[in-house]
């Protein structure tokens, strides 16, 4: 069997993207890094996004950290998801930065969250810390769009959280708010502050926040599609 090669340009169809992702299934991160001419770090402490970057290279992703999807021409977002030996997610999944100001007129249909989750290529990767990074294997990909029920619940969560932001209740939001979607601080250090709306409508400084999918959502999604018991 010939070895796979990284795509040198963005895939032109979903079929091409999925076929390339399927070729990576079963390879270790170390093998894929070596084939792409990259060095595998010892761990992810200083390279938290390394797995995502590696797979973006292999799949010809174009967006980088821009607000558009990773495969903008296809409207597809790439999400790697670390899983345990039973295929269950080990952590929540970052979706996008939460906008804390300038939210008048924003709706679920026009939100960054919905745009990012409209069509997702999920790639599970072994994530247990007992497995050295280079030895962790890539799993089978899943090209997914939310069904009606998932979209409804995500919308309800988003609307609840955005209402709290707009009404100046940002400091009251905890990770427990939302059934599937949560908002958490997203900052490497506590000095990286951003503007938000305070309880009396005044401008305040607070930690940047991000939208994350809770593990109960991604766990059910993977179980349904991969028939995990």
Curated annotation (Swiss-Prot):
GO terms for biological process: DNA modification; mismatch repair. Coiled coil: none annotated. Its main location: cytoplasm. One of its GO terms (molecular function) is endonuclease activity. SUPFAM superfamilies: Restriction endonuclease-like (SSF52980). Sequence-specific endonuclease that cleaves unmethylated GATC sequences. It is involved in DNA mismatch repair. Belongs to the MutH family. This is DNA mismatch repair protein MutH. It comes from Escherichia coli O6:K15:H31 (strain 536 / UPEC). The gene is mutH.
């Amino acid at each position: 069997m010939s070895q796979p090669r990284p795509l040198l340009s963005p895939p032109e169809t979903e079929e091409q993207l999925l076929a390339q992702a399927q070729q990576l299934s079963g390879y270790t991160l170390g093998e894929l890094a070596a084939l792409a001419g990259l060095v595998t770090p010892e761990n992810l402490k200083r390279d938290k996004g390394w797995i995502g970057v590696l797979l973006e290279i292999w799949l010809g992703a174009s967006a980088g950290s821009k607000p558009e999807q990773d495969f903008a021409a296809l409207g597809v977002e790439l999400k790697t998801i670390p899983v345990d030996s039973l295929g269950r997610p080990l952590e929540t999944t970052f979706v996008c930065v939460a906008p804390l100001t300038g939210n008048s007129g924003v709706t679920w249909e026009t939100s960054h969250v919905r745009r990012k989750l409209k069509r997702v290529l999920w790639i599970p990767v072994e994530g247990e810390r007992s497995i050295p990074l280079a030895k962790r294997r890539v799993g089978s990909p899943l090209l997914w769009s939310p069904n009606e029920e998932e979209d409804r619940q995500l919308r309800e969560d988003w609307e609840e959280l955005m209402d709290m932001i707009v009404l100046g209740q940002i400091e009251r939001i905890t990770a427990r708010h939302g059934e599937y979607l949560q908002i958490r601080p997203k900052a490497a250090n506590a000095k990286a502050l951003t503007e938000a709306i305070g309880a009396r409508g005044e401008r305040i400084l607070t930690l940047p926040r991000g939208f994350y999918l809770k593990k109960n959502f991604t766990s059910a999604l993977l179980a349904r599609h991969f028939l995990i018991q």
